[in-house]
Amino acid sequence: MAMRCFLICFPFSFLLFACNNRGNIPDVSGIKVNLEVQRFENDFFSIDTNTVSRGLQSLYQKYPSFTPVFFGGVLGLPDSAAIIQNEARRFISLNRPIYQEAERRYKDVGKIKSKLQENFQFVKYYFPSYSIPTIITLVGPIDGMAKMENGDYSTDFLGRDFLGISLQFYLGKDFSVYHAQYFVDNVAPQYRSRRFEKEYIPADAMKLIVDDLFPDRSTGKPLIEQMIEKGKQWWLLDKFMPGSADSLKTGFTQKQLAWCNANEGLVWHYFVTSENLETIEPSVIQNYIGESPTTQGMPDSSPGNIGQWVGWQIVKKFAGENPSLKPEEIMTAAPRKILTESKYKPK
């Protein structure tokens, strides 16, 4: 399809999609969630580098499940007391400026805690047996992200009984390190680091909860199935964050969301006529799913990851056609069933 067939400019339409109609949002005010937030970075960077061994002992006592993950998984150190002591001393010295910036921006995390607590109320509403993790903030390497089971990279990570929030990736889009050439080339290009803002923390955290409940194992499947499986993830995320802006959940800008909504029919026609929906070729799939500034073959106004957005619309249509289905039933429904029964034919 020629690029000129897409509508490029809708100057007022973004206003229509900032707060979508969520239908009936359940009342979760009576659901008790005792969310605990622990500040690992404060204890870690308070260690006296002259007596690191004593400080590490206190860390292991206070954070018994998190500390081994921090040193082994986050810092990538072997299980050697001597190496951990030396590298901890070195890390504290080299990264103190990053910690100080995080401390300045996140001295009080009360608002973030309140938002997460509200999100977890919705989690408990839909999945009462889900165990709420302790939130642990940290400052880790500025050049390392956590690799998730589905192959994506996340700023945060989920452990057995904790959810780690890496504050070094939420220091504001204008933070100087994010604009250094090494960081842009090797860690996060600016179309991603523009989201390294405080308001994205709850959505990033809830994405981990969604993936914990229903891991995305669609890799290797045809494009249309991956689109729908990933669309399910955003559909459930929307259930956990019904009052939050779609821009925070998708990572799209408001203008990109407006473009998607204005061109939904053309985008779907593009997929159908391109004959790519059944492809399993990774290089083709990568063009439509995953992080990128825009979608190749579509106007610059389009966002990257357009495939997940289309999958989300299909799942929403399927859920609307089947209002009696519970979230678990929708999340476990076969992609082909969802596609067929959604009767998805946007104009």
Please annotate each region the language model reported:
Residues 45, 75, 121-128, 237-245, ...:
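Sec-exported extracytoplasmic/periplasmic mature domains
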Residues 1-6:
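Positively charged n-region of N-terminal signal peptides that target proteins for export
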Residues 87-257, 332-335:
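Acidic/His-rich structured neighborhood in mature extracellular/periplasmic domains
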Residues 272, 278-347:
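C-terminal soluble interaction/assembly domains
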Residues 20-89, 93-94:
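N-terminal mature-domain "stem" immediately C-terminal to a signal peptide or N-terminal signal-anchor/transmembrane
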Residues 15-18:
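C-terminal motif of bacterial Sec signal peptides marking the signal peptidase cleavage site
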Residues 227-294:
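Acidic/His/Gly-enriched intrinsically disordered linker/tail segments
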